[in-house]
Amino acid sequence: MTATARKGGQTVTVKEAVVSGLQRRYRITAANAKPTVDYDTVVDTASGWLEWPATGQVSGTAKQIVTVVDSTKSGANARAKGEATLPAPTA
């Protein structure tokens, strides 16, 4: 998983495709506030997780962490997790 700078934000690329029956969500946090995600952790929108943008474009600040989770569509239970450090957006 990589994060590259773009004007006004970042583009996050996840090499692996989403497996059938799963959905992808993400959260951006400070490095010292990364979420703990284990197998079956609930990553629903009520818990602050966001739907994955088809473009992979997100908006954060330099050195924040983007955590990306593939989860079940029913119950939003985590199945896979990745993270990357965001670069500063370009001007």
Regions found by a protein language model. Give the residues of each.
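Acidic, Ser/Thr
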Residues: 13-21
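Surface-exposed, short loops/turns at beta-strand junctions within beta-sandwich domains
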Residues: 49-63
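Short coil/turn motif common to extracellular beta-sandwich-like domains
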Residues: 4-14
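Short beta-strand segments within Ig-like beta-sandwich modules, predominantly Fibronectin type-III
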Residues: 39-52
